[in-house]
Regions:
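Exported/periplasmic ABC-transporter solute-binding proteins
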Residues: 1-204
Length: 204
């Protein structure tokens, strides 16, 4: 809001206290958030209610959701993480989640879940790779795939948004969004495991 940058990045919508009417927001793509467990876990599918209760500590043993008789290790990101903000908003666990570990990077979450057969966490869908020792569970029977993010059936997702000051006439802003809307720009987004969206280019 102080005009120190042409563009701002968000992985959520602007909040009322952030003066959304002062900005134009452009959704670049959608990112699924995978709810991940160890690749050898017997758990393949969880309901949103089960996920909520696991992260708030109401469910604390895998046997309660069809897994082995073992305590659940709940792993999350640090408080400033956009992935954490998105996940906690979707499952309504802000200020309620009880983490055994809060980690600074996606890679650390992946490593912890891969090394602990009783762990559960969340990461951007692009980071889910069974070769790294983790897998994303289905949510209400829906697989965590880019296709299901795009068609809206996999609802654990968040937007990647860029904002700029409403009424800005800086040619760099227009050129940037023209590039992102081009075939090359859209392919770069898709190559990152994200779901491209139709990008509205400023006409100033």
């Amino acid at each position: 809001t102080q005009g120190t940058a042409l563009l701002g990045d968000l992985s959520r919508d602007l909040k009322d206290e952030e003066n959304p009417d002062d900005f134009t927001a452009v959704t670049l793509c959608l990112d699924g958030i995978g709810v991940v467990v160890n690749k050898d876990s017997a758990v393949e599918d969880l309901t949103p209610d089960q996920i909520t209760k696991i992260f708030t500590g109401e469910i604390s043993n895998w046997s309660e959701v069809g897994g082995e008789d073992a305590p659940i290790t709940v792993v999350g990101r640090e408080a400033a993480s956009g992935t954490r903000d998105g996940f906690e908003s979707i499952f309504d666990v802000k200020d309620k989640a009880k983490y055994a570990l809060e980690l600074q990077e996606t890679g650390l979450v992946v490593s912890k879940v891969a090394s602990d057969k009783n762990a559960i966490g969340y990461v951007s869908l692009a980071s889910v790779d069974e070769e790294k020792g983790i897998k994303a569970v289905k949510v209400d029977g829906i697989e965590a795939t880019e296709e299901n993010v795009a068609n809206g059936t996999y609802t654990v997702q968040r937007p990647f948004v860029q904002i700029y000051k409403k009424g800005s006439t800086d040619p760099l802003i227009k050129a940037w969004f023209e590039f992102l809307a081009s075939d090359e720009g859209q392919q770069i987004i898709a190559d990152k495991g994200l779901v491209p969206q139709e990008i509205e280019v400023p006409n100033n």
